[in-house]
Amino acid sequence: MARVKRGVQANRRHKKILKRAKGYYGARSRVYRVAVQAVTKAGQYAYRDRRNKKRTFRRLWIARINAGARLNGLSYSRFINGMKKANIAIDRRVLADIAMHDAATFTALVEKAKAELA
């Protein structure tokens, strides 16, 4: 049986990891052993933060909608309640965008929500 030498595979594996670690500080981008740990940890952070990003953006949208609603004399929760009662189904991302860039349209939405609450 022929002897199996794994130099080629090891070299490929090392290159793949070091390529992913490019731009890391110090030994993290140069030493394979350290780079493996850095790349693994980076993957864990990326996985976690892809989920956290959704929460973060939702919080941002709510803050923006709340600010716009309060400028028109309504709290966020009452505004959302009024929108649901008026059967206006616009998601928070779009509402936040309208609140930021189109004040007149947002004011009209707030007025419709107020009318439903009254």
Swiss-Prot record:
User: Is RNA-binding included in the keywords of this UniProt record?
Assistant: yes
Pfam families hit by this protein? Ribosomal_L20
- UniProt xrefs under InterPro entries: Ribosomal_bL20, RIBOSOMAL_L20_CS, Ribosomal_protein_bL20_C
Q: Which UniProt keywords apply?
A: Ribonucleoprotein, Ribosomal protein, RNA-binding, rRNA-binding
Q: Which domain of life is it from?
A: Bacteria
- What would you give as a GO molecular function for this chain, any one? structural constituent of ribosome
CDD domains in alphabetical order: Ribosomal_L20
Q: What PROSITE patterns does this protein's entry cite?
A: RIBOSOMAL_L20
Supply one GO CC term from the record.
Answer: ribonucleoprotein complex
Keyword rRNA-binding in annotation: yes
- Name its GO BP terms in alphabetical order: ribosomal large subunit assembly; translation
The entry's family comment says: Belongs to the bacterial ribosomal protein bL20 family.
The role this protein plays is: Binds directly to 23S ribosomal RNA and is necessary for the in vitro assembly process of the 50S ribosomal subunit. It is not involved in the protein synthesizing functions of that subunit.
The record's listing under PANTHER family reads: 39S RIBOSOMAL PROTEIN L20
Recorded protein name is Large ribosomal subunit protein bL20
Q: Which organism is it from?
A: Psychrobacter arcticus (strain DSM 17307 / VKM B-2377 / 273-4)
Q: Which gene encodes it?
A: rplT
